[in-house]
């Protein structure tokens, strides 16, 4: 699996976060994003109320449960040689500061690296994710997802934001599940577990 592929997939996640207003995911500043409870706690500092939806993406090789109002984008990301790679991603924002996303892409035809060393591919994807989200590793667990090499990791940034991810290398395709939260208080462990454990690789266009 190409190192470039791992980098490209992280760029998609960062793209969605940075352009969430332009994409219509949240309202511009001053349009209600600072709603508070009666106790004065900002809406972004408490767990989102999530309604889940079972999603069958067999044509893309997977099934998963995600928060409702799922959207999809395809973002052109450019590799170090100037070539464009189209990366697919589905995502949902149950509140303005909480995001659940799945990105996937196949191995590029050129610039392959570490094709026979899954652990190195997952290491590179993890390290680049933390670099680009400006987070520091908190915990990490190697695992097997239906017999495929996978990796769970959790990271945080200086502002208290939490980034949870699961990387799955299924044959020649790399999947990345990501859940991001503005703070530890806004993160609910059972939501992350439900999201990650609902993901299944199925026969499709792999």
Specify the residue positions occupied by each region the protein language model found.
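Signature of long, low-cysteine stretches enriched in small and polar/charged residues
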Residues: 61, 65-91, 123-170
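A short acidic-to-branched-hydrophobic micro-motif
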Residues: 89-119, 176-177
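N-terminal, intrinsically disordered, polar/charged segments of Gram-positive cell-envelope systems
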Residues: 26-46
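N-terminal "mature-domain start" segment
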Residues: 40-87, 144-145, 193-206
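Short, low-complexity patches enriched in S/T/P/G
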Residues: 1-2, 20
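Hydrophobic single-pass membrane-insertion segments
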Residues: 12-31
């Amino acid at each position: 699996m190409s190192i470039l592929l791992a980098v490209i997939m992280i760029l998609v996640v960062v793209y969605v976060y940075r352009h969430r207003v332009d994409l219509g995911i949240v309202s511009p500043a001053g349009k209600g994003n600072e709603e508070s409870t009666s106790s004065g706690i900002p809406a972004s500092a408490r767990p989102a109320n999530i309604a889940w939806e079972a999603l069958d993406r067999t044509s893309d090789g997977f099934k998963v449960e995600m928060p409702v109002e799922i959207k999809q984008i395809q973002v052109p990301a450019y590799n170090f040689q100037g070539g464009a790679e189209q990366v697919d991603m589905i995502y949902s924002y149950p509140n303005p500061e909480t995001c659940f996303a799945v990105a996937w892409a196949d191995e590029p035809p050129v610039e392959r690296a570490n094709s026979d060393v899954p652990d190195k591919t997952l290491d590179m994807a993890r390290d680049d994710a933390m670099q680009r989200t400006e987070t520091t590793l908190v915990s990490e667990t190697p695992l097997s997802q239906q017999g495929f090499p996978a990796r769970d990791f959790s990271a945080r940034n200086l502002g208290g934001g939490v980034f949870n991810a699961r990387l799955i290398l299924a044959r020649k395709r790399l999947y990345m599940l990501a859940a991001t939260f503005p703070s530890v208080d806004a993160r609910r462990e059972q939501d992350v577990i439900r999201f990650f454990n609902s993901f299944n690789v199925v026969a499709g266009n792999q």
